[in-house]
Amino acid sequence: MSAAAASSAAGDSAKQPLLHHQRGNPPHVASVSSPSLPSAPPGALAGGRRFPGGLDVPNLKKRGGGTRSWIRVEAATASVQTLEVDKATMMRRCELPARDLRLLDPLFVYPSTILGRERAIVVNLEQIRCVITADEVLLLNSLDSYVLQYAAELQRRLLQRAEGDELPFEFRALELALEAACSFLDAQAAELEIEAYPLLDELTSKISTLNLERVRRLKSRLVALTRRVQKVRDEIEQLMDDDGDMAEMYLSEKKLRTEASFYGDQSMLGYNSVGDGTSFSAPVSPVSSPTESRKLEKAFSLCRSRHDSVKSSDNTATEHIQELEMLLEAYFVVIDSTLNKLTSLKEYIDDTEDFINIQLDNVRNQLIQFELLLTTATFVVAIFGVVAGIFGMNFETSVFSIQNAFQWVLIITGVIGAFIFCGFLWFFKYKRLMPL
């Protein structure tokens, strides 16, 4: 036994260096250097990865997930404050996915969008990018005057709330966002109209390269603005046509339902705990049966009241859907009017282009007619020159013996050329190639 143990220990001691040699890095491999591979920069070894184009991945991650400045407008007190919140905190606070918050990122260019979620409304309308909840509005802090005006105007309206105004807070915030976006787009359309019509009138009277270049830039701006207005119009129209999306935006009612359901569940849990306590403490006696019946009636009345509250909340939600639809319809009319302005301006530009093309075609036709006349005259003169050249050759003929014979040849050739030219003109008129 001792010999076997000794041999086993010797075998294990012999295997240990081999295992250590297999697991660790071989010393001769570590000493080999490859001259063809460049050495990695310190940032790539320690901090993170750097791509050949100079792209710093850690900095991009910090930039994407860093804190942002938000303007918070509270519904209850109408107070305005600035918050520094990162993206993950905002997602947990409003229960929004990352793709919804990406719509509000100023680094990305997204079309106008209005999304109704469980606890928030995501609004991306031109410069106004915000998250509307039942209790607050979180607006991306920006130096844009429209953003600051939106926050100030919302605070003013919350402080000066009219007595007959029954709209929930989220609808009022959404209304102000629609008003700001529609006003901004309408102002840009009006500015474009003021600049476009005089320029187009000048172009019809004087066609020049400078005027054509100005009209080209104007048309590019018009197409871009029309696309933005059309997207806002389509977004409002899509909301108006879908009752489910409008009901999803009624955040105050959903909050009341959640609170009522929570308190109702708490009451039912309290009743069950009391019932369980009486059943375990003592057997049910005939004296305690009225108490149990009263508790049962109370539970039934609680369920009935919850059912009635849900039913009344459904009726209230239907009324508010109609109010939201009327609100959206009002701004749909405004944005549709702006779109009609831009459409009329585009039609005016198209008419001006058609008029210019007609003028250019007319000038081109005149040039072609002049070239045709010039070619015909050149042909007649060439005939006259051929005759004169023939008689100018050095050969003997009886014509040269007659006095003034060469002059008569020239006169006759000219008359024949004139008749040929008149014949061509008559042919052009007959074929309607030239208005003569």
Curated annotation (Swiss-Prot):
CC per GO annotation: membrane
Kindly list any coiled-coil regions of this protein: 176-242
Keyword Lyase in the entry? The reply is no
Top-level taxon in the UniProt lineage: Eukaryota
- Pfam family name, one: MRS2-like
Chain ranges for the short sequence motif Required for magnesium transport activity as given in the UniProt record: 392-394
Query: Which terms are listed as keywords in the entry?
Result: Coiled coil, Ion transport, Magnesium, Membrane, Transmembrane, Transmembrane helix, Transport
What does the entry give for GO biological process? magnesium ion transport
Stretches with biased composition (Low complexity): 1-14, 29-54
Q: What exactly does this protein do? A: Magnesium transporter that may mediate the influx of magnesium.
The entry's protein name is Magnesium transporter MRS2-B
Species: Oryza sativa subsp. japonica
> What taxonomic ancestry is recorded?
Eukaryota, Viridiplantae, Streptophyta, Embryophyta, Tracheophyta
